[in-house]
Swiss-Prot record:
Gene Ontology CC annotations of this record: cytosol
Gene Ontology BP annotations: CMP-keto-3-deoxy-D-manno-octulosonic acid biosynthetic process; lipopolysaccharide biosynthetic process
Function summary: Activates KDO (a required 8-carbon sugar) for incorporation into bacterial lipopolysaccharide in Gram-negative bacteria.
Origin species: Aliivibrio fischeri (strain ATCC 700601 / ES114)
EC number(s) reported in the record: 2.7.7.38
CDD domains according to UniProt: CMP-KDO-Synthetase
A molecular function GO annotation: 3-deoxy-manno-octulosonate cytidylyltransferase activity
InterPro entries xref list: Cytidylyl_trans (IPR003329), KdsB (IPR004528), Nucleotide-diphossugar_trans (IPR029044)
Family affiliation: Belongs to the KdsB family.
Catalytic EC class: transferase
Identification of the protein by name: 3-deoxy-manno-octulosonate cytidylyltransferase
Record-linked HAMAP family: KdsB
Length: 249
């Protein structure tokens, strides 16, 4: 199986400016992400950025970097530009790994690529079972439900499926655990151009979940439970300190 990993990295961040270049035990965060992705067996790992500072750092540690427009409205549009600039063929599998996940397990990058290769869907992603009560009703923990074949029926910030009887009795962790979506995607490269030419859907605007556009237009997304539960990404200075503590051991 052949696949390419693309890691979008933007300098601007509301809660942590310059996040991709934040030092973690002597290396910038984006280098940690790049090195984890490079262990997944991909043919190529590309960092996509619109910032010359990130470009210089990536070149400095020997990484593959593609400069993109600063005017994209979504990360998916940025992927489409990289695919065109780098000559990635339409049937190639592309895995999108977030640039703020220095602890991402290489195994799940490979898993989502393999799942797409084995499925009839043009897109695949992963989930983990919810075992923390706080996540059940947390709108920032996106839930997903699938059909019998593992294809997504819906993604929501609400608690789906709603366990009427269990919740009525005050229970929060149910006998059939809810699934929390994690933000790693695999696509057929050609599908990304199809996707960005669709108009945003009503549902994605309501939920603020871009992946709902795929279901709205009748395409499939394969979902599997991740082999390893990834650690949380870095969104705040507090998250950064936690990651530094883990990687310093």
């Amino acid at each position: 199986m052949s696949f390419t990993v693309i890691i979008p990295a933007r300098y601007q961040s509301t809660r942590l400016p310059g996040k991709p270049l934040a030092d973690i035990c002597g290396k910038p965060m984006i280098q940690w992400v790049y090195e984890q992705a490079s262990k997944a067996g991909a043919d190529r790992v590309i960092i996509a950025t619109d910032d010359s500072r990130i470009e210089a750092v990536v070149k400095g540690f020997g990484g593959d970097v593609c400069m993109t427009s600063p005017n994209h409205e979504s990360g998916t549009e940025r992927l489409a530009e990289v695919i065109e600039k780098c000559g990635i063929s339409a049937d190639e599998i592309v895995v999108n790994v977030q640039g703020d996940e220095p602890l991402i397990p290489p195994s799940i990058i490979q898993q989502v690529a393999q799942n797409l290769s084995d499925s009839v869907a043009p897109m695949a992603t992963l989930a983990v079972t919810i075992d923390e009560e706080d996540d059940v009703f947390n709108p920032n923990a996106v839930k997903v439900v699938t059909d019998a074949e593992g294809y997504a029926l819906y993604f929501s910030r609400a608690s789906i499926p709603w366990d009427r009887d269990a919740f009525a009795q005050g229970e929060t962790l149910t006998a059939n655990p809810l699934l929390r979506h994690i933000g790693i995607y695999a696509y057929r490269a050609g599908f990304i151009n199809t996707y960005i030419n669709w108009q945003p859907s009503v549902l994605e605007k309501i939920e603020c979940l871009e992946q709902l556009r795929v279901l709205w237009y009748g395409e499939k997304i394969h979902v599997a439970v991740a082999k390893e539960a990834p650690a949380a990404g870095v969104d705040t200075p507090e998250d950064l300190e936690k990651v530094r503590a883990i990687l310093s051991k």
